[in-house]
């Protein structure tokens, strides 16, 4: 049996501080207004303000508390968001392993199986700026797909080409995967 290791897959987040400041400012403003309403209003308005606070906390938890990881021992890709059930897909049993664009400037590796669909964002050119997954992650994904689903060589060659491009310092917008955006 292969030695099992869990590899955390980092999220491809915006590098622009203004995006994070805007997000944080919005959350603080919503909580401040709802808190003021809870403190000063009565009846239904107070209940609604309390619900806004609760909904905001849940939404922030869903954005912040998410994890995607790869178990190299059994070739399984896992994804968990806040309190929702975990989704996992084994490379060998996946019905689909391919690239998927979201029509908003992001390209993800999508693995679909019986227990759900897991996506790993590989490339983005959107409001958050240009960014690509790192070469080490791209190569690990390619190696794991080759190990568990060797019939997917076309996809793994694309991942390796992207890894070489990123490692050479190439711009995400000019990368091999950029034509799929």
Please provide the spans of the model-predicted regions:
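Acidic, Ser/Thr-rich low-complexity segments on the non-lumenal side of membrane proteins
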Residues: 86-124
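Hydrophobic alpha-helical transmembrane segments
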Residues: 21-22, 40-54
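N-terminal membrane-targeting/pre-transmembrane regions
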Residues: 1-40, 166-181
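Short leucine-rich amphipathic alpha-helices used at interfaces
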Residues: 48, 71, 171-174
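Flexible, glycine- and charge-enriched loops at secondary-structure boundaries
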Residues: 46-47, 87, 131
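Conserved beta-hairpin
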Residues: 51-98
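Generic recognition of long tandem-repeat/solenoid scaffolds
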Residues: 7, 12, 77-79, 109-111
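A membrane-cytosol interface segment of integral membrane proteins
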Residues: 112-174
């Amino acid at each position: 049996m292969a030695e099992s290791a869990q590899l955390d897959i980092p999220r491809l987040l915006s590098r622009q501080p203004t995006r994070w400041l805007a997000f944080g400012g919005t959350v603080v403003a919503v909580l401040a207004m709802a808190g003021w309403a809870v403190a000063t209003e009565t009846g239904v308005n107070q209940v609604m303000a309390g619900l806004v606070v609760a909904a905001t906390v849940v939404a922030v938890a869903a954005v912040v508390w998410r994890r995607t990881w790869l178990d190299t021992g059994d070739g399984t890709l896992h994804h968990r968001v806040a309190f929702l059930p975990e989704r996992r897909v084994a490379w060998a049993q996946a019905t689909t392993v391919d690239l998927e664009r979201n029509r908003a400037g992001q390209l993800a590796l999508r693995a679909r199986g019986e227990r759900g669909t897991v996506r790993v964002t590989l490339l983005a050119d959107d409001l958050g700026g240009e960014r690509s997954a790192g070469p080490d992650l791209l190569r690990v994904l390619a190696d794991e797909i080759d190990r568990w689903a060797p019939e997917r060589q076309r996809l793994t060659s694309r991942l390796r080409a992207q890894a070489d491009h990123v490692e050479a310092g190439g711009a995400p917008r000019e990368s091999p995967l950029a034509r799929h955006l």
